[in-house]
């Protein structure tokens, strides 16, 4: 679905769970996994990602939940496709491959629009 906005991608991904988990348990796992990530923020339970909050940045907002009726994991993610686009991804990957700090050349807060 195309939304009437000039930039940004809001994506929802679902996956079938192989064991029964609560939203709180999955949220804790994601929060722990991404705790040291420079660019990924796992939002508090119930707070949805907003593309406008990421305009011009290399950051990602993520929300996780469990749909207990269907036993599916639901992950919602927002990025600014012009901030965290192919060029920024290439810089981030090159930094990692060359042993540089992952954030080198990518530390910008965005446009604040």
Q: Each predicted region: which residue ranges?
A:
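NAD(P)-dependent Rossmann-like dehydrogenase/reductase catalytic/cofactor-binding core
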Residues: 61, 66-113
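C-terminal substrate-binding/catalytic lobe of Rossmann-fold NAD(P)-dependent oxidoreductases
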Residues: 1-75
């Amino acid at each position: 679905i195309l939304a009437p906005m000039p930039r940004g991608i809001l994506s929802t991904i679902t996956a079938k769970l192989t064991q029964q988990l609560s939203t709180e348990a999955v949220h804790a796992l994601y929060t722990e996994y991404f705790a040291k990530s420079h660019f990924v923020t796992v939002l508090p339970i119930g707070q949805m990602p907003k593309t406008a909050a990421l305009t011009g940045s290399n950051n990602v907002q993520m929300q996780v939940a469990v749909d207990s009726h269907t036993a599916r994991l639901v992950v919602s993610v927002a990025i600014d496709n012009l901030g965290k686009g192919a060029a920024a991804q290439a810089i981030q990957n090159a930094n990692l491959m060359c042993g540089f700090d992952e954030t080198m050349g990518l530390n910008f807060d965005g446009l604040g629009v």
